């Protein structure tokens, strides 16, 4: 598990491009036959990717978390971004097609990832946060998630938001998780920008062609920077940072948050004239 410490906005505004990427961009989450994880000290969030092949992959704490098992003090949200697979939780099987979500609560000991077809394996993305109470394990197919339409073609941000884990959906301690799909010929997300100083956020960009890129904007509103992001790469967004992007083509991204105020609408919008 890779370890990344929290950062100050005063320090970040002096970072080079390489340093920005080192601190905030997760370039490699998906390796066939392995689980890759990154621990960020922003709200103690763990970001991970798993591609099970012929053998299942077990989610364990390793040496880093200093617990007997991964979910001893945590909860986790999982979304499959690839072909059909399943997750087995303490003996119970949960099938996930592409874009389906599974929430697993505090205290579940044995969690493993499986692909239905090892020649065309599932690609599981997960985000974990600290937990203080056990909520039930629940799967939510994308067909059962309530879509919210936002934006317009004129603004190049016509998109659909699916909220999976939130106060009016799958219940959790603090984790919030969902997905945004942009329509063809629409490239902007989260503009006008916002911040939520009580919660960090992580974006995973996917459904992109190999030669497509997203220019992800970050930093304080008056001190913005950008990261150039490829398919299936994640961005760690500190609580003090905006998180917005524009692509060379349309894309999909998964957003996940942890921290205080378990409310999707708890955010402070930034006026366009205040962005620099």
From Swiss-Prot:
GO terms for biological process: D-galacturonate catabolic process; D-glucuronate catabolic process; pectin catabolic process. The gene is kduI. It comes from the Bacteria. The keyword Isomerase applies. Binds 1 zinc ion per subunit. Its cofactor is Zn(2+). Its EC number is 5.3.1.17. Catalyzes the isomerization of 5-dehydro-4-deoxy-D-glucuronate to 3-deoxy-D-glycero-2,5-hexodiulosonate. Keywords: Isomerase, Metal-binding, Zinc. GO terms for molecular function: 4-deoxy-L-threo-5-hexosulose-uronate ketol-isomerase activity; zinc ion binding. Belongs to the KduI family. It is an enzyme of class 5 (isomerase). It catalyses: 5-dehydro-4-deoxy-D-glucuronate = 3-deoxy-D-glycero-2,5-hexodiulosonate. Pathway: Glycan metabolism; pectin degradation; 2-dehydro-3-deoxy-D-gluconate from pectin: step 4/5. Zn(2+) binds at residues 194, 196, 201, 243. This is 4-deoxy-L-threo-5-hexosulose-uronate ketol-isomerase. InterPro entries: KduI (IPR007045), KduI/IolB_isomerase (IPR021120), KduI_N (IPR027449), RmlC-like_jellyroll (IPR014710), RmlC_Cupin_sf (IPR011051).
